[in-house]
Amino acid sequence: MSKNWQDITLALAGIFQATHLVDQVARTGHLPPDAFKCSIESLLDLNPPDTLAVYGGDAANLRTGLEIMRELLRPSSSKYRETLRYGLGVLHLQKKLAGRRDMLGVIGSRIDQAAQQAETFGSTHDNVIANLGGLYSETISTFRYRIQVNGEYQYLQQTRIANQIRALLLAAIRSAMLWRQVGGNRWQLLFYRKQISWQVEDLLRRM
């Protein structure tokens, strides 16, 4: 069966965009609103018609993630180390989550509630983000393995930013689930880098 490398690449970009935003807000206290909105809304739509629809129907919404992937796929790249570390941690957590149907059920139900809340307040409203951050704490944070986020203490101690980080990690896990669903696996990151890199360049070129 042939792989849909574009779908695999889009889902990977979703992961790395969300984890880069985690690193960014942890270090600076700020988030680019459009990229943040894309990541959060990708989490809220659980029944999209196709992969691109998860990210608002436009690959340009994933420009940040695709540009990071372009750099990560270069030989001996040393940039975005924290983004990569968080991304690999997300893949590990998603694999753990896949074996917990009970937890998946809770997450699905709570995301439905958050989606309804977003219709009233907007997807990136503090109330919605607090709901999603709380969901991460009550579910994903109960696994033995946890992603340790590095950043400035003055930002990490703020409840609002802590909620944003947890909501973004949940969004990254959602993209990791999508990545698995469309045929993604970790071996591709080692042996099929050229196919993925070609898709990254093609998607960026068409923006």
From Swiss-Prot:
The keyword Ligase does not apply. SUPFAM superfamilies: YcfC-like. It comes from the Bacteria. It is found in: Cytoplasm; Cell inner membrane. GO terms for cellular component: cytoplasm; plasma membrane. Its main location: cytoplasm. InterPro entries: HflD, HflD-like_sf. It is a peripheral membrane protein. Coiled coil: none annotated. Keywords: Cell inner membrane, Cell membrane, Cytoplasm, Membrane. Belongs to the HflD family. This is High frequency lysogenization protein HflD homolog. It comes from Cellvibrio japonicus (strain Ueda107) (Pseudomonas fluorescens subsp. cellulosa).
